[in-house]
Amino acid sequence: MLSSIKCVLVGDSAVGKTSLLVRFTSETFPEAYKPTVYENTGVDVFMDGIQISLGLWDTAGNDAFRSIRPLSYQQADVVLMCYSVANHNSFLNLKNKWIGEIRSNLPCTPVLVVATQTDQREMGPHRASCVNAMEGKKLAQDVRAKGYLECSALSNRGVQQVFECAVRTAVNQARRRNRRRLFSINECKIF
């Protein structure tokens, strides 16, 4: 089993990637928006009684940082592609921009689609035009993501589940890779 996992968050600016990380790592919600250029942090998590060091890499969604963003992709074990349910363009950009960038840099790394700011569906000014769960699930299927999750860093709903799923997805991918290696090492050849 993996003793450390690298999890990279991508998506447009201001979709809530940093808020999601802050809520998960410090159980607080940042009051002011602060654009991210490149940031990483780590926490220890437990899965099935085993401690895993989870490295969390927050990337800039702004196109001005497109050239340095791939540096954070190196050796990623799982990618969280995030969009805000209140920002339809951020949703469309997962398919039109982000999945292409991820697949060209990390062709075999599992991806999860994460809908953020779900509290906006109940109380936001754009609640009537918010992206619904069915649209999000369909997008996840279209981009061949390993899963679809929803969360709100503001209300702390679904945050823990996002990272539990990320860890489980990375561990399962590593197990599959190891099984394939075992089979290729133990191949029997008859001449």
UniProtKB/Swiss-Prot annotation:
<dbReference type="GO" id="GO:0019210">
    <property type="term" value="F:kinase inhibitor activity"/>
</dbReference>
<dbReference type="GO" id="GO:0030217">
    <property type="term" value="P:T cell differentiation"/>
</dbReference>
<feature type="lipid moiety-binding region" description="S-geranylgeranyl cysteine">
    <location>
        <position position="188"/>
    </location>
</feature>
<dbReference type="GO" id="GO:0007015">
    <property type="term" value="P:actin filament organization"/>
</dbReference>
<dbReference type="GO" id="GO:0007165">
    <property type="term" value="P:signal transduction"/>
</dbReference>
<dbReference type="GO" id="GO:0045576">
    <property type="term" value="P:mast cell activation"/>
</dbReference>
<dbReference type="InterPro" id="IPR005225">
    <property type="entry name" value="Small_GTP-bd"/>
</dbReference>
<comment type="similarity">
    <text>Belongs to the small GTPase superfamily. Rho family.</text>
</comment>
<dbReference type="GO" id="GO:0045582">
    <property type="term" value="P:positive regulation of T cell differentiation"/>
</dbReference>
<keyword id="KW-0963">Cytoplasm</keyword>
<dbReference type="GO" id="GO:0019901">
    <property type="term" value="F:protein kinase binding"/>
</dbReference>
<feature type="binding site">
    <location>
        <begin position="116"/>
        <end position="119"/>
    </location>
    <ligand>
        <name>GTP</name>
    </ligand>
</feature>
<dbReference type="Pfam" id="PF00071">
    <property type="entry name" value="Ras"/>
</dbReference>
<comment type="function">
    <text>Negative regulator of hematopoietic progenitor cell proliferation, survival and migration. Critical regulator of thymocyte development and T-cell antigen receptor (TCR) signaling by mediating recruitment and activation of ZAP70. Required for phosphorylation of CD3Z, membrane translocation of ZAP70 and subsequent activation of the ZAP70-mediated pathways. Essential for efficient beta-selection and positive selection by promoting the ZAP70-dependent phosphorylation of the LAT signalosome during pre-TCR and TCR signaling.</text>
</comment>
<keyword id="KW-0160">Chromosomal rearrangement</keyword>
<feature type="modified residue" description="Cysteine methyl ester">
    <location>
        <position position="188"/>
    </location>
</feature>
<dbReference type="InterPro" id="IPR027417">
    <property type="entry name" value="P-loop_NTPase"/>
</dbReference>
<dbReference type="GO" id="GO:0006355">
    <property type="term" value="P:regulation of DNA-templated transcription"/>
</dbReference>
<dbReference type="GO" id="GO:0031267">
    <property type="term" value="F:small GTPase binding"/>
</dbReference>
<dbReference type="GO" id="GO:0005525">
    <property type="term" value="F:GTP binding"/>
</dbReference>
<feature type="short sequence motif" description="Effector region">
    <location>
        <begin position="33"/>
        <end position="41"/>
    </location>
</feature>
<keyword id="KW-1003">Cell membrane</keyword>
<feature type="region of interest" description="Interaction with ZAP70">
    <location>
        <begin position="73"/>
        <end position="86"/>
    </location>
</feature>
<dbReference type="InterPro" id="IPR003578">
    <property type="entry name" value="Small_GTPase_Rho"/>
</dbReference>
<keyword id="KW-0472">Membrane</keyword>
<keyword id="KW-0488">Methylation</keyword>
<dbReference type="GO" id="GO:0003924">
    <property type="term" value="F:GTPase activity"/>
</dbReference>
<keyword id="KW-0636">Prenylation</keyword>
<keyword id="KW-0342">GTP-binding</keyword>
<keyword id="KW-0597">Phosphoprotein</keyword>
<keyword id="KW-0547">Nucleotide-binding</keyword>
<dbReference type="InterPro" id="IPR001806">
    <property type="entry name" value="Small_GTPase"/>
</dbReference>
<dbReference type="GO" id="GO:0005095">
    <property type="term" value="F:GTPase inhibitor activity"/>
</dbReference>
<feature type="binding site">
    <location>
        <begin position="58"/>
        <end position="62"/>
    </location>
    <ligand>
        <name>GTP</name>
    </ligand>
</feature>
<protein>
    <recommendedName>
        <fullName>Rho-related GTP-binding protein RhoH</fullName>
    </recommendedName>
</protein>
<keyword id="KW-0225">Disease variant</keyword>
<dbReference type="GO" id="GO:0007264">
    <property type="term" value="P:small GTPase-mediated signal transduction"/>
</dbReference>
<dbReference type="GO" id="GO:0005886">
    <property type="term" value="C:plasma membrane"/>
</dbReference>
<dbReference type="GO" id="GO:0001772">
    <property type="term" value="C:immunological synapse"/>
</dbReference>
<feature type="propeptide" description="Removed in mature form">
    <location>
        <begin position="189"/>
        <end position="191"/>
    </location>
</feature>
<dbReference type="GO" id="GO:0005737">
    <property type="term" value="C:cytoplasm"/>
</dbReference>
<feature type="binding site">
    <location>
        <begin position="11"/>
        <end position="18"/>
    </location>
    <ligand>
        <name>GTP</name>
    </ligand>
</feature>
